[in-house]
Amino acid sequence: MLFFIVYNDGSHTEQILKLLESVKEYGKEFEIIVFNRSDIDNEYYIRYNYILSLPRGGGYWLWKPILINKILKIVNENDIIFYLDSQYYFTENFTNLYQEYMQNNDILIWKNKPNCPVY
């Protein structure tokens, strides 16, 4: 199974909607899962609220390992998880983008510089 995941803390909703539209158009084979703050365990959120409440990175990206752990509990062996930050979107089918590279690799990571000058 193919999963496309994204995190929405409410600060980039317009960009996330554009990203999700592009996934629905160009990645029809993906099951889309949108995580948000309510997916962070309450105990963890309370303990690290001083970080998670900071605006940069939705709390300095502290939510990423939490959501990675959650998605890994959902997926099965050989499933594919595709994650993209909200500032990006697809303009064409991206099946070849991952299929070609996944033949010889278990994990793919791309490095992109966000369009936002503050990062």
Language model regions located:
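Glycosyltransferase catalytic domains, chiefly GT-A lineage
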Residues: M1-Y119
